[in-house]
Design a protein with these regions (language model features):
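HotDog/MaoC-like acyl-thioester-processing domains
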Residues: 71-76, 80-123
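Short alpha-helix capping/helix-loop boundary micro-motifs
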Residues: 62-67
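Short, surface-exposed secondary-structure edge patches
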Residues: 32, 68-69
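Hot-dog-fold acyl-thioester-processing enzymes
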Residues: 1-61
Length: 123
């Protein structure tokens, strides 16, 4: 993840928290450097899981989003996903709902984000 990616995403989403783009401000925090915007981390890790999990589905939402460790520019993030449940849709014949837990890990295998999401897929 590049510093520019974080700054661009932070500015595009109008996040004015200087912890994400002001190195001087961030130097005075416990982390001593800018943090990657957590919504960028959520978007990135979701995107990393799409090809394997939801490429032809519809995301119905996230829940239980946790950020146990910070992400910094220069970190390498990977995703892993576990299927928690599956069922046929009650309102849409021919479709199913899959619930998954996805974790994002950095290059030190530290979990930096974890969330559940539900996806509607055609059967």
């Amino acid at each position: 993840m590049l510093e520019a990616d974080n700054v661009w995403f932070t500015l595009l989403t109008m996040n004015t928290n200087p912890i994400h783009f002001d190195a001087e401000y961030a130097a005075g925090t416990e982390w001593k450097k800018p943090l990657v915007d957590s919504t960028f981390t959520l978007a990135l890790v979701t995107g990393l899981s799409v090809q394997d999990v939801s490429e032809h589905g519809v995301n119905l939402g996230w829940k239980e989003v946790r950020l146990p460790a910070p992400v910094f520019a220069g970190d390498t993030i990977r995703a892993e996903t576990e299927v928690l449940a599956k069922r046929e849709s009650q309102s849409r014949p021919g479709f199913g709902i899959v619930t998954v837990r996805t974790r994002g890990l950095n290059q030190r295998d530290e979990v930096v984000i974890e969330f559940e999401r539900s996806i509607m897929l055609e059967l």
